[in-house]
Amino acid sequence: MVDHVHFERELTLLKSDVSKMLFLVSESLNDAIESLETMNETLARKVLESDDMIDELNREIEEKAYQIIARYNPILKQLRYIITILKFSNDLERIGDLSCNIAEKCLFLSEEKIKFEMLKELKDMFGSTLKVVQDAFKAFVEEDVDLAFRLWKFDDVIDEMEKKIRRIVVERIREGNISAELALVYILIARDLERVGDHANNLCEEVIYIETGKNMKEFLRGVESGSEGADS
């Protein structure tokens, strides 16, 4: 039988660890983007160094989650909640890895002495992707299902941004206005940001599940029928 008082206390602590990890990942992504915008090698290296802390926190969350499962033998609904927390943590860890990828582009450009010209479209994608991750953090902390749902719907916008950047880069290559090395960097950065968007989208689905107990298919049916409170 589950000791509900201690069980809920440990779940609260677990969620607090995830909140801390979400803050670190959001900060890392912000630093990675800023390092590239300003070609700040020191900031780029800070992102790479902070990844170890994010990875360690992810491992701690996994270990605590498995200990909770072993100690309390939770019922199916509680087990699904814990597994969702684990998925949330793993998505954060992947965003941390992608932030490192972006920071590494700064170091590569600097080492190869390639002049980086910031595309307006890439800057826009930087801003949109960072805002989605930061707002996912807000939705998680404030248990805001409506915000999570609005962010979830925004994923298509980020996908279109990535496609637009790819088209612009291809056109510049055809016109001879960009080197092959810089073109590849643009495309890889846009791809990394699109993947960050995918993981942020997962975070939103996980917030919705944690707060409503419904997967996205069930939640969307509720939105369509008017039984869910999220804005359409």
Swiss-Prot record:
CC per GO annotation: cytoplasm
Superkingdom, taxonomy of origin: Bacteria
Entry keywords, A to Z: Cytoplasm, Phosphate transport, Transport
Record localization: Cytoplasm
InterPro entries: P_transport_PhoU (IPR028366), PhoU-like_sf (IPR038078), PhoU_dom (IPR026022)
GO molecular function: protein homodimerization activity
Pfam families, sorted: PhoU (PF01895)
Coiled-coil residue windows: none
BP GO terms, sorted: intracellular phosphate ion homeostasis; negative regulation of phosphate metabolic process; negative regulation of phosphate transmembrane transport; phosphate ion transport
Subunit field text: Homodimer.
PANTHER family associated with the record: PHOSPHATE-SPECIFIC TRANSPORT SYSTEM ACCESSORY PROTEIN PHOU
NCBIfam families membership: phoU_full (TIGR02135)
General function of this protein: Plays a role in the regulation of phosphate uptake.
Family: Belongs to the PhoU family.
Protein name as annotated: Phosphate-specific transport system accessory protein PhoU homolog 1
UniProt source species: Thermotoga maritima (strain ATCC 43589 / DSM 3109 / JCM 10099 / NBRC 100826 / MSB8)
